[in-house]
Amino acid sequence: MMRISMSLPKKLLNEFDEVLRDRGYQSRSKGIRDALKDYIVRYQWMNEMEGERIGIIAVIYDHHYTGVMEDLADIQHDYREYINAVMHVHMTERHCLEVIVVKGDVAKIRELTEKMMRLKGVEHVRLTSTSTEQKIEHEH
């Protein structure tokens, strides 16, 4: 196994340690390995999607971070043909949640998602989607 060193904000490390305690982990290293595996699986899942998709992108950001709201708006304008609706929620004094309803080519939706992920001030981004071709059975 390789040994690495990393810097984390104290609050993030405290929250991570709390999750590890709640889940009964005996080792922080094991928790980090599991978290990294989950991150890789989510990345692979996102890259394996193809075709037309419909879904939501949930974005949590610190609106006190200079320029983040403008950057998010600019990106959304660049991908407006894939965005059906946006809902904005004030979570706390500092944090906002945007839920973006998307539909279209998954490559463009993935591109949109990844551009928002890279922004400074954005703390969490999650894409959830399904194929537009999926048949939904209704009971009558």
UniProtKB/Swiss-Prot annotation:
Keywords assigned by UniProt, alphabetized: DNA-binding, Metal-binding, Nickel, Transcription, Transcription regulation
HAMAP family attached to this UniProt entry: NikR
Upper classification of the organism: Archaea, Methanobacteriati, Methanobacteriota, Methanomada group, Methanobacteria
Protein name: Putative nickel-responsive regulator 2
GO biological process terms held by the UniProt record: response to nickel cation
Taxonomic source organism: Methanothermobacter thermautotrophicus (strain ATCC 29096 / DSM 1053 / JCM 10044 / NBRC 100330 / Delta H) (Methanobacterium thermoautotrophicum)
Entry's cofactor comment: Binds 1 nickel ion per subunit.
Annotated InterPro entries: Acetolactate_synth/TF_NikR_C, ACT-like_dom_sf, Arc_rbn_hlx_hlx, CopG, CopG/NikR_regulator, Ni_resp_reg_NikR, Ribbon_hlx_hlx, TF_NikR_Ni-bd_C
Pfam families: NikR_C, RHH_1
Gene3D superfamilies linked to this entry: ACT-like. Chain A, domain 2, Met repressor-like
NCBIfam families, alphabetized: PRK00630.1, PRK01002.1, PRK02967.1, PRK04460.1
